[in-house]
Amino acid sequence: MQKFYQRLKENQKERARCAFLVLYFGVLAVLLFLARPLLDTTAADREWSIHFLFPCLLACIILTTVVSFCRFAAKPDQKPKPRYVGWKQPILMLANAAYLFATLEFVTNSQFREMKWYYALLNIGVIFVLSILVSLFLNSIRRAMIFMNIFYFCMSLVFYYVYLFRGEAFQLIDLYSIATAADVVGGYKFEITGEIVTSFITMMLVVRLWLQSREYRFARKTRNKILLRVAAAALTLGTYLAYMNLNWNAEFGVISDLWNPAKTYRQYGTTVGFTAVAKYMRLTPPDGYSKDEVTAIADTSEKETKTEDLRKDNADACQALCL
């Protein structure tokens, strides 16, 4: 402890980092208390919030603060070299995948508690595979987990608000109309729920822990890094081909309701439901689609509309002269 105090006294950067940690966890604690009314929307939620959710979130903030400061105090003067991935890291990645599944369903799925356990395991497995692919491309367990946590929180907001505003679940095909969505998004009123606040706080805590964790990599030398990316690309391609060509969804009992994707998401989980529906809704134009023909039809329709308006204006002018 004396060494830690001496380091803070002599090093301005260390004092700034310590102040940032205090501010970081202080803001999360204040946010939790300010968002307390959002956790008590109904009588049942209020009872659950008072006796479980709010105390657990507060305890998580306190515990993460203690762990974070202990890590900060025990940090060596020199940055430790990255280690190779061992058997412990996949276990942590699997635990993180389970957490990502739980937070995504907590925000977006009103039937989360009714989901069958083997569908929950299937969702965790899919997220775990995605985590492995990302970690291979980034050559870093820590950076991959930080990316996955932030990405899944953002996707939970996308799934929640798209369904709230449109009444239909977000699908892969919606990426075609992302520009239109960006134009109209300002006209909607965004309301934050208790689930979103809870997910945000836990995400920030988990990201903080991953930021202070030891760096583990698959390769160190440049040649090995290049080979790793090539292998990751080949593995990704193989995973995609298996995903598109194998009847995995039927084998696991996942029935895609293409007319009501939200039902599929709620029943089988958002991750599995999204991938199952996306399998039959590719980002490819339908048969016979021609951009030039669509443009020509639109131009013709616009000209006909202008002609009809001109005729109507002439008729109104003639009628006015007659009167």
Q: Residue locations for each model-derived region?
A:
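Transmembrane and membrane-interface helices of multi-pass
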Residues: 2-265
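Soluble catalytic regions of membrane-associated enzymes that act on cell-envelope
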Residues: 246-323
